């Protein structure tokens, strides 16, 4: 073990010594190479190395007073080739580029509302005037009446009485105010002429739909 360690130590020392000897020489060689390159490139070019500019004519050289032949013809030809500016054409071109005004929409007319028809209330029907039946005084002597019928329907009694009175007959009921469900007699008269009452039985039947009987009148 000791011999191996010693061998390694000796080898390491030899390598370090070689590095110390060889590295300075390498570094000096590189420095010299860089110095040679700097020396090869001159900082300021020599006078003979610069390219001399072409010989320019002197500023004081006199220019020709007359243009060369053919120059005037070329100028005139160029003027003729140039298009002439017509004032009308210029004005037309200017008008072409003027922006067109935006179309203005006409105002929409307001819808006219039709007048609402006035709804007139229908006139109330006028009640027909009932014919005035003259109340004849009951005869003082013997009198007669026509009994048309006896009904329990109070509405039907009132309907028949209205028709007969509208035709001009003298009509009354017993009892005087019809009561629903109770018997009510319909009587026409009284009249002193029995024959007259008998002659009216046909018309009374047409108006009321009832067959009447002539009988003696007894005042209540």
Swiss-Prot record:
One of its GO terms (molecular function) is enzyme activator activity. Residues 57-70 have a biased composition (Low complexity). Pfam families: SPOR (PF05036). Residues 100-109 have a biased composition (Pro residues). Residues 138-217 form the SPOR domain. Residues 110-119, 127-137 have a biased composition (Basic and acidic residues). The SPOR domain binds septal peptidoglycans and is required to target DedD to the septal ring. Belongs to the DedD family. Non-essential cell division protein that could be required for efficient cell constriction. This is Cell division protein DedD.
């Amino acid at each position: 073990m000791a011999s191996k360690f010693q061998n390694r130590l000796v080898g390491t020392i030899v390598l370090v010594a070689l590095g110390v000897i060889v590295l300075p020489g390498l570094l000096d060689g590189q420095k010299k190479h860089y110095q040679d390159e700097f020396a090869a490139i001159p900082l300021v070019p020599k006078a003979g190395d610069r390219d001399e500019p072409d010989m320019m004519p002197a500023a004081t050289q006199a220019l020709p007073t007359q243009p060369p032949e053919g120059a005037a013809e070329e100028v005139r030809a160029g003027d003729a080739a140039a298009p002439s500016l017509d004032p009308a054409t210029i004005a037309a071109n200017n008008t072409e580029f003027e922006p067109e005004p935006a179309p203005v929409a006409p105002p929409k007319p307001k819808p006219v509302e039709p007048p609402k028809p006035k709804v007139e209330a229908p006139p109330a029907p006028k009640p027909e005037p009932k014919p005035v039946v003259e109340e004849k005084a009951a005869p003082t002597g013997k009198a007669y009446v026509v009994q048309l019928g006896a009904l329990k329907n109070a509405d039907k009694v009132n309907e028949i009485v209205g028709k007969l009175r509208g035709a001009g007959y003298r009509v009354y009921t017993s009892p005087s105010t019809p009561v629903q469900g109770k018997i009510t007699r319909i009587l026409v008269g009284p009249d002193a002429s029995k024959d007259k009452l008998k002659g009216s039985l046909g018309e009374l039947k047409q108006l009321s739909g009832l067959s009447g009987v002539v009988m003696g009148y007894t005042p209540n």
